[in-house]
Amino acid sequence: MEPGRIVDTTAGPALCVKVCLVGAPQGGTMLNELYHSLDPVAFSAGPITIYWYGLAYMVGALLAGFVMYRTQKRWNIGFTPDDVMTVVIAVVFGLLIGGRLGYVLFYSNGYYFTHPLEIFFGTNGGGISGMSFHGGLAGGLLGGLFACRYLRLSPLTVADASFVGVPLALCLGRCANFVNGELWGKPTDLPWGVVFGGAAGNVPRHPSQLYEALLEGVVLFAILYVLSRRAKPLSQGSYLGIFVLGYGIVRFLIEFVRLPDAQLGYLAGGWLTMGQLLSLPLIALGAALLVYAWKTRRPQHRDWL
């Protein structure tokens, strides 16, 4: 979740999207505009409020862990359910800490350097807002590495099996971004433009969250899942490399139709965003991992290193 693109998500009717026809000038065409009016609250029970965003994190972690277990079982690696659960917990902790610190370092424009207590305690009791995928990825990888060291498991095989299911978690997270009405795109006259209202104004915009859910989530998962079902798995580092390279390319391209963070704007040339800048190292890292996998051709295995 990244402030600066958040619209009014505290008000509005129950979960729904209104579709209406807006009249065009005479001789023109009719344009379907989707009006965003989704409630970020999934349900409430007394003082407890559950948000779609939190549910996306929880269900996404469980899905990724399930796919990881099934994948390594198909590869005959020998991870136990306890191994997988330990890795998932470590990755989630690393992801949350890394995602928050990544936002603080790259997207807050120095705000938290003068308000350090708000990094993990929120602002005036208003809760914590602001997560960075790139920071979350780094934190998740470090958390997974520590878990592998503790369990004496091969980090690359764990990463390969894990990242087959990670796109499913990404898909849910981007859908939650859409429900929250945040991270919206630039104005568009395409038929599926969404009017988010609030800070986004009453103009149709690219639903860039859904573009990412489709490409980073569904498409990337389909590619990795099909490759994971080969009779002989790809060599160590291949699946991680495909994910990192694929995500970096998709994120770089989607940023062209996604508004930059309001507090940062464009970094250079009137088009380069922080998301694109941070995606360039991912593209290089993904390509390097694939070259490494191709040259070493190390088979997937269980034990540390």
What is the role of each PLM region?
Residues 18-20, 25-305:
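A feature for loop-to-transmembrane-helix boundaries and adjacent hydrophobic helices
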